[in-house]
Amino acid sequence: MEKLKLTGSGSRAFGPARLYWREGAPLRISLAYRGAYGLGERFTPYVKNGQTVETWNEDGGTCTEISYKSIPFYITNRNYGVLVNDPGPVSYEICSEHVTRVQFSVPGEKLDFMVVGGDSMKNVLENYTTLSGKPALPPAWTFGLWLTSSFTTKYDEET
């Protein structure tokens, strides 16, 4: 997998992407796709088309778009995914009324991202987890009954 880092001004095309940067503006990338999925825990529709997504880990509860499990990686139906390797907030504009592609930006003058390809969406995820690390199997107790205090406080109710 090739890692691309860009700083500077102007526009540079590579593969299906175009990079944009103007003095004083966030660095942006725009990629062609038909369906985008991912970006970690979100309380919005699974298919991200038409959404503006801000990834920043915060505990906002289930009634907001804020989450504390943001993952700056999305996958498309065109057999590629994009990982934005930035510790700060990342803003995604996903085929909304403002853009016809996926566009993402970060504050500052440096954008560090990786385009992860594969023969299928499954293969893209395999390549991504090779890069980021494979998840461990959770302990058996996590597959049992869970109680939540998000929606009820009466634990004497029958379940």
Question: Which role fits each region the language model picked out?
Answer:
Residues 1-140, 148-150:
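Catalytic and substrate-binding clefts that recognize carbohydrates or anionic sugar/phosphate headgroups
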